[in-house]
């Protein structure tokens, strides 16, 4: 099944995608990971993306669509994957429909107060990319990854000033996707304020219907 995860930054999309990709053998495609890989490799697109992200802005549709479509085309199994962070707006959603069919949308619903707490507490492993949270998913040892013992860091766009910009962009561009996908009965809502096990259980129940 082809899944798209929708929801504001910090709603747990990435964490749940990583968990289910292991349990259900789905490939997890994160636009954030794709962007960071290009930045790390200092590709021409990566240099452009780096400056855009550091300014707290969203990467242009033309770049995002190309990176995602190219990645999907490299997959051996194009029927079982999770898209995390794409599409972000109607233009991207329409572009996605031109090269993918039979997509189910998972919409993560979360109270904004909980959202801010999650975002400010998020920590990421510098070595393996593992995602933790000092409030909701703390590591056994402070600042150290449970998976590989790498050091944890806080992303620049998880600090308050960048958070405000990201949430504004979400409300302006991403939320209309809910209406877009509701019209053709592809939208499945999940209460993302539950703990990780609860969200995972809800998602598996949805997947089992299709």
From Swiss-Prot:
Q: Which residues bind ATP?
A: 10-15, 122, 131-132, 194
Mind telling me which Pfam families this protein's record contains?
Answer: ADK, ADK_lid
Highest taxon listed in the record's lineage = Bacteria
The record's GO molecular-function terms, alphabetically, read: adenylate kinase activity; ATP binding; zinc ion binding
Which principal EC class is assigned to this enzyme? transferase
What quaternary structure, including any partners, is listed in this protein's UniProt entry?
Monomer.
Put simply, this protein is called Adenylate kinase
Q: Which organism is it from?
A: Borrelia turicatae (strain 91E135)
Species lineage, top-down? Bacteria, Pseudomonadati, Spirochaetota, Spirochaetia, Spirochaetales
């Amino acid at each position: 099944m082809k899944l798209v995860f929708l929801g504001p930054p910090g709603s747990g999309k990435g964490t749940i995608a990583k968990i289910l990709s292991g349990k259900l053998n789905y490939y997890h495609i994160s636009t954030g990971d794709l962007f960071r890989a290009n930045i790390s490799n200092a590709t021409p697109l990566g240099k452009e993306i780096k400056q855009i992200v550091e300014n707290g802005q969203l990467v242009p549709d033309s770049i995002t669509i190309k990176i995602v479509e190219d990645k999907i085309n490299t997959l051996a199994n194009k029927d079982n994957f999770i898209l995390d962070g794409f599409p972000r707006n109607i233009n991207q959603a329409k572009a996605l429909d031109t090269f993918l069919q039979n997509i189910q949308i998972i919409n993560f619903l979360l109270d904004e107060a909980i959202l801010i707490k999650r975002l400010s507490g998020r920590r990421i492993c510098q070595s393996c990319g593992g995602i933790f949270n000092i409030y909701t998913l703390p590591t056994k040892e402070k600042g150290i990854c449970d998976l590989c013992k790498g050091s944890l860091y806080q992303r620049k766009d998880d600090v308050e000033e960048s958070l405000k910009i990201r949430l504004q962009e979400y409300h302006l561009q991403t939320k209309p996707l809910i209406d877009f996908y509701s019209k053709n009965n592809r939208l499945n809502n999940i209460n993302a304020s539950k703990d990780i096990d609860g969200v995972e259980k809800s998602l598996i129940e949805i997947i089992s219907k299709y």
